[in-house]
Swiss-Prot record:
It comes from Bothrops jararaca (Jararaca). Residues 136-156 are annotated as: Disordered. This is Zinc metalloproteinase-disintegrin jararin. Its cofactor is Zn(2+). The lineage of its organism: Eukaryota, Metazoa, Chordata, Craniata, Vertebrata. Snake venom zinc metalloproteinase that inhibits ADP-induced platelet aggregation (probably by binding integrin alpha-IIb/beta-3 (ITGA2B/ITGB3)) and degrades fibrinogen. Binds 1 zinc ion per subunit. Monomer.
Length: 156
């Protein structure tokens, strides 16, 4: 019951309104129901999911942006799965790394590799310039590879 109420209040913090009578989640009660039920739900309704998705796209699209390496304030640590300043790549500890483009012990690219990951990286090589790496939404144009990086830049 406590977890259900916490999920409900978190929903409000994320900008989700209480469900209307027409909302459905495939259960007797949904997380964002305006009334408390004896049978707490673990599901958000179609209305809640639509509202959250719409708000995320229309108002909080920046949350979908990948952080820059320079945004991280802790010292770089090779083996944490996140490429930080000074690392070319980071595929985790050597025992777990499954990326042939990345040397897990050094967090540097393997010999002959141009990239280790990203929408513009294919088999350790940069995808040629002008290839679409992310379709545009709304008025935003398609994002295209530069041919100089494995990352897909935002062409907004």
């Amino acid at each position: 019951f406590v977890a259900n109420r916490m999920a409900h209040e978190l929903g409000h913090n994320l900008g989700i309104d209480n469900d209307r009578d027409s909302c459905s989640c495939g259960a007797n009660s949904c997380i964002m129901s305006a009334t408390v039920s004896n049978e707490p739900s673990s599901r958000f309704s179609d209305c809640s999911l639509n509202q959250y998705s719409s708000d995320l796209i229309n108002y909080y699209g920046c949350l979908l942006n990948e952080p820059l390496r320079t945004d991280i304030v802790s010292p770089p640590f090779c083996g944490n799965y996140y490429p930080e300043v000074g690392e070319d790549c980071d595929c985790g500890p050597p025992a777990n790394c499954q990326n042939p483009c990345c040397d897990a012990a050094t967090c540097k690219l393997t010999t002959g590799s141009q990239c280790a990951e990203g929408l513009c990286c294919d088999q350790c090589k940069f995808i040629k310039a002008r290839q679409i790496c992310r379709k545009g939404r709304g008025d935003n144009p398609d994002d295209r590879c530069t041919g100089q990086s494995g990352d897909c830049p935002r062409n907004s």
